[in-house]
Design a protein with these regions (language model features):
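An N-terminal boundary/leader segment
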Residues: 1-46, 53-56, 266-272, 443
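Serine-dependent amide/ester hydrolase catalytic core
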Residues: 8-12, 24, 303-397
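Acyltransferase
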Residues: 15-23, 49, 99, 256-279, ...
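Residue-level signal for inorganic ion chemistry
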Residues: 25, 44, 219, 243, ...
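Immediate post-signal peptide segment of exported/extracytoplasmic ligand-binding proteins
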Residues: 51-68, 235-243
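Short glycine/serine-rich loop/turn segments
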Residues: 64-206, 246-248, 361-380
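Short helix-loop capping/hinge segments that flank enzyme active sites or metal/cofactor-binding pockets
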Residues: 65-87, 240, 295-347, 404-414
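Structural helix-boundary/capping segments
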Residues: 107, 160, 164-251, 262-271, ...
């Protein structure tokens, strides 16, 4: 499938139209097991028909008028139940209003195909869901492999060509991880960049939103639409772009992940980028803080879900999710206060350390693991989840916007990813840099 920008260009030229694009998406979605929790076909057809009429009249609402997209089932859509991937919410009241982001993209003319699957309550980086099924990674041709999570269905919906864009959320890596494992672009915004009104939360300090796409230009276009901007972006030369390659973690990642990243670095250097290879003291200190004092998201997720854990509905939770939530029940408040205090200092330290550069790391240390052993073995699930989240958690803790880009494949054809990150609030600069980096890697 082409990206959303190319699809919209076809609408403008008359080579295709939104109704045709939607029907293809609905057909593919209906034949893709466990990718969607629900389809919003009636709404989508109304939106597509209206968009097609606007294109015929030469009056599109935006460059993406009529482009189909999917929403992780944490976003409220009026008339639909927001399940959060949890069995106990199957019969929750339907949302009365669209989430703020849903409304903005709807007013730009985009067509909402449905709501995608996810790890229950968005609380795993692997994407397994025993209630609604686990979406299969499209690259797992030898045997079923994990999609990555928690935005599992959103990633697979794009990677499998059902839709060109799907919205996700990211608290510890939930956009960036599935993007890397499915060969996509995944953009985690700074937590305050978009309104989270109408989005089911996990950890208020760390939750962020963003798209999974097939190109950086599509991610930039979504960012513009969510800020009610209309502009066209052209990749600038990467010459002079400063990057810091975090060397300290490279020994810990799979050879294919490391080799593909280093190959990308050589391409960028050849194109004129200034790449400094060294350990990042702030990144390493953040890894150490998480290891020693625990994950801020664990404190906040327990506080949010304690009423659920203390209710009869807790019996309906995936036991693995329930155990992970319960593990934070006994954590002392002093530990939380310490993490928050150090976090603030590290955020300022990062700004000073990078001094305008972009941090470059692997997104995930490995390619997508085989699914069956993780379904069968609780200990393997826990250790693999921690390993999968390890390299994205520091960026989340420091609220760093991040863009995961495809960096290549391993010998089996499984995707690897690299991660570009910047200090909190520097999303626009990061996205421009990602567009330039992508243009080099694609050539």
């Amino acid at each position: 499938m082409s990206d959303a920008t190319s699809m919209a260009e076809d609408f403008a030229s008359g080579r295709s139209d939104p109704v045709q694009a939607l029907e293809q998406a609905l057909d593919s979605a209906s034949r893709s097991a466990s990718v969607f929790i629900s389809l919003t076909a009636e709404r989508a057809r109304r939106e597509a028909e209206a968009a097609a009429a606007r294109w015929r009249a030469g009056q599109p609402l935006s460059a993406f008028d009529g482009v189909p997209l999917a929403w992780k089932d944490l976003f409220d859509m009026a008339g639909s139940i927001t399940t959060a991937g949890a069995a106990y919410r199957r019969h929750a009241p339907a949302a009365s209003l669209d989430a703020s982001c849903v409304g903005l993209l709807c007013r730009a003319g985009m067509v909402s195909v449905g709501k995608t699957n996810l790890s229950e309550l968005a609380y795993s980086g692997l994407g397994l869901n025993p209630h609604f099924g686990t979406p299969r990674n499209p690259y797992g041709t030898d045997q079923p492999r994990i999609p990555g999570g928690s935005s599992s269905g959103s990633a697979v919906a794009v990677a499998a060509g059902i839709v060109p864009i799907a919205m996700g959320t990211d608290t510890a890596g939930s956009i960036r991880i599935p993007a890397a494992l499915n060969g996509l672009v995944g953009y985690r915004s700074s937590s305050r960049r978009y309104s989270r009104d109408g989005v089911f939360p996990l950890a208020h300090t760390l939750d962020s939103l963003g798209p999974l796409t097939r190109s950086v230009r599509d991610a930039l276009a979504i960012d513009d639409l969510l800020h009610d901007r209309r502009q066209r972006h052209v990749a600038r030369s990467v010459k002079g772009q400063r990057l810091v390659l975090e060397h300290g973690v490279l020994a810990e990642v799979d050879p294919a992940v490391r080799n593909n990243l280093l190959r990308a670095v050589e391409q960028l250097k050849a194109a004129g980028a200034r790449v400094e290879t060294r350990e990042s003291p702030t990144f390493q200190a953040t890894l150490a803080l998480i290891k020693r004092h625990g994950w801020l998201g664990a404190f906040e997720a327990f506080a949010l879900h304690q009423p659920l854990l203390d209710s009869a509905d807790a019996e309906q939770l995936d036991p693995r999710v329930r155990r992970r939530l319960e593990a934070a029940r006994s954590l002392p408040a002093s530990q939380l206060i310490h993490v928050l205090d150090v976090r603030q200092r590290l955020q300022q330290q990062l700004i000073d350390e990078l001094d305008g550069a972009i941090l470059l790391t692997p997104t995930v240390a490995h390619v997508a693991p085989v699914l069956a052993p993780l379904e069968a073995d609780d200990e393997l699930f826990v250790s693999t989840n921690l390993a999968t989240l390890r390299l994205t958690m520091p960026g989340s803790l420091l609220d760093m916007p991040g863009v995961s880009l495809p960096s290549g494949r391993d010998a089996q054809g499984l995707p690897t990813g690299l991660l570009l990150s910047a200090p909190t609030g520097e999303d626009a600069r990061l996205l421009r840099a990602a567009l330039s980096v992508e243009s080099v890697l694609n050539n």
